[in-house]
């Protein structure tokens, strides 16, 4: 296993909610990342992020590791939730907040 995969695994394991995105939550660099961050932020939970534009090694390796080709990618409790479309669908159904709230139950 290469060092980048280990780094990704460590990030996912050490952050109950993490999004791999283009840009930052305050300054997204693409519309999909902006929409995803807005939905996640609306749930009222803190989350970590990794800017894949500033981390080209992660941008290259994460799609292979996750078997998910695009960004953003939302991970909750070590599980890939999905990209922008799935995040927005869960948000619109009211299920994103429930999914993210699982972190409270598992970490208490």
From Swiss-Prot:
CDD domains per the UniProt record, alphabetical: GRX_PICOT_like
One GO cellular component this record assigns the protein to is: cytoplasm
Gene3D superfamilies according to UniProt: Glutaredoxin (3.40.30.10)
Keyword terms: 2Fe-2S, Cytoplasm, Iron, Iron-sulfur, Metal-binding, Redox-active center
One GO MF term: 2 iron, 2 sulfur cluster binding
Q: What is its main location?
A: cytoplasm
Q: Which InterPro entries match?
A: Glutaredoxin, GRX_PICOT-like, Monothiol_GRX, Monothiol_GRX-rel, Thioredoxin-like_sf
Family classification = Belongs to the glutaredoxin family. Monothiol subfamily.
Assembly, per entry: Homodimer.
Entry protein name = Glutaredoxin 4
Organism, per UniProt?
Answer: Buchnera aphidicola subsp. Baizongia pistaciae (strain Bp)
Q: What are the top taxonomic ranks of the organism? A: Bacteria, Pseudomonadati, Pseudomonadota, Gammaproteobacteria, Enterobacterales
């Amino acid at each position: 296993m290469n060092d980048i995969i280990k780094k990704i695994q460590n990030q996912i394991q050490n952050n109950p909610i993490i999004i791999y995105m283009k840009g930052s939550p305050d300054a997204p660099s693409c519309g999909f990342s902006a929409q995803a961050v807005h939905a996640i932020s609306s749930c009222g939970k803190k989350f970590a992020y990794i800017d894949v534009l500033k981390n080209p090694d992660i941008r290259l390796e994460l799609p292979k590791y996750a078997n998910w080709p695009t960004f953003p990618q939302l991970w909750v409790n070590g599980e890939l939730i999905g990209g922008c479309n799935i995040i927005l669908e869960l948000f619109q159904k009211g299920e994103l907040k429930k999914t993210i709230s699982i972190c409270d139950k598992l970490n208490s």
